[in-house]
Structures are given as C-alpha cells and as structure tokens.
Amino acid sequence: MLGGHNGAGARHGRVAALAVAAGMWLASGAAAAGEIYLRGGFGLDRPGDTAFMDEDCSSTAPAALYGCGTGGDGAPYRSAGGFGTVPAVGLGLGYAAGAARFEALVEYRPAFAFRGRTNFLAPGRQQSVSANLSSVSGMLAGFVDLGAPGLPELGRLAPFVGAGIGVVRTRIGKTTMTFPTTTTTVPGGTRTGLAWMATAGVAVALGERVTLDLAWRYTDLGAVRTKRGPGRVVWRDGSQEPRPLDLAPTRARLAGHGVRLSLRYVMGGF
C-alpha cells in the first residue's frame, strides 16, 4: 500500500518538475530587466474523493486500524469520503520580466474537514468518520504570459499558464469513527512532503501597478497521514470500560481542482 502511494507521489513530482522546467524554458527569451511584485489573494479547492487506508494492513504491533479484509461494500477496509470545499489564502513575492514571471508563493488552508464512512458494517448502517485539518504550503512557481504578437487578442484579458513545486505541511486532528453502539477515536498527525500545482488563467490590468488574476488551479498536496499512537473505543451506553488501542498510521491523498482570485501590485523595477 505504502509503495503505491510513494510511486504515485514520485510520478506526480516528476510531472510537476518537468512542467516548471518547460515554463522556464519558454520564458527564457524575456528581457533581463524586470519588476518586483507582491501578490495577495484567496481561493477555493475541491479535492477529489479519497479514502483513508492502512499504510500496512497486516501490522499487528501497532495494530492496523482497518486490516486486510474486505468490507460490506466489497472494497478493502477503508474510510471513503471527501474533504469538501477547502478555503485557501495566499501571499507571493514575484519577479516579472517580459513574458516570464517567477514567484515564491505561500498558501495557508486554515480549516477544512474530512467527512466519510467506513465499510466495516453492511451498507446503510451507521459508520461515519470525521476529522478536521489544516495545511500550509510553499512553492516556487513559474508563469508565462501568452499575450504575444500573433496570438488571438482577448481585449483587456491577458491569458497565462504556470506551474510550481514545493513542500507542504498538513495537520489532521483526532479522527472520530461513530458506529451504532461505539465511538472509536484515532490519533491525528502531521506530514511534510512534496506539493505541486499547475494553473491557467487570465489577468486584467486595473491600473499602472495593479493587476487582477483569475485562475484555475490543480493542486496536489500529497498524503494526509494519521500517526502511530493511542486510540480508544468507547461504548456510549457505558456498558463496558473504554478499550485502549495502539494504532498504526493511515493515509489518504489530498489533491484536486480549484480557483484563485488575487491581486498583483508592482513595487518597482530594476
């Protein structure tokens, strides 16, 4: 299981690196003199459906949360669901020279949640799962403005494409699994790993120094990971004492499409 996640992450990282390199190559003919700018903005992401699964379903010490069996829906044991709509705020410091822009970008996703269901029981029975998350990412990005001579004109709109690669730190809080008579808690965790994005959008000049950007963005933040640690099972009617658990890590992928709206302010040139 873990090997599959790592392989996918490596492939995604190579794609991102090649995309950034291509952007830099396309922009290499830009003039040497340029302008420094600041960016501030916000956005919304809609990650794709995902599932938390054991890193090693055969682990016994610590114990795998799900194990290697097949659930009531015929799929491997897991918690399937989604992260809903994820808000993001971003700040960037960039350098623009001709058709090329290079930017150091930080994005913070202050609060979002996983909501899903396990498949230990038959479909239709109560087995909900929930957890709260946050993340912060830092990337180096390259953009190419496409409003070059010979291309179709879009009035005041200036199209652009870009890509970036960097690191992300994602935190997940305690996970709560609610069954018909019991509640299981799973320890949270943090993970630092590779992040990358690809984007395309349009820019509108609002003044001599201010530009509005509206963009589509695909962002891959890698894996969300619960750590090894103590969990427990509680019988809500008090019929039994809580049962402590020593649990192995689980993980799920966090990636999806979104939109960004931001302002660029040119501070000066050199």
Descriptions of predicted regions:
Residues 1-35, 269-270:
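Cleavable N-terminal export/targeting peptides
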Residues 40-42, 89-97, 106, 140-146, ...:
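Residues on the lipid-exposed face of transmembrane beta-strands in outer-membrane beta-barrel proteins
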Residues 47-84, 107-138, 167-193, 222-258:
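Extracellular/periplasm-exposed beta-strand and loop segments of Gram-negative cell-envelope proteins
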Residues 30-35, 147-158, 206-209, 268-270:
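Short loop/turn motifs that connect adjacent beta-strands in outer-membrane beta-barrel proteins
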Residues 33-48, 159-161:
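Transmembrane beta-strand segments of Gram-negative outer membrane beta-barrel proteins
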Residues 35, 84-90, 101, 135-139, ...:
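Transmembrane beta-barrel architecture of outer-membrane proteins
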Residues 35-37, 253-270:
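Outer-membrane beta-barrel "beta-signal"
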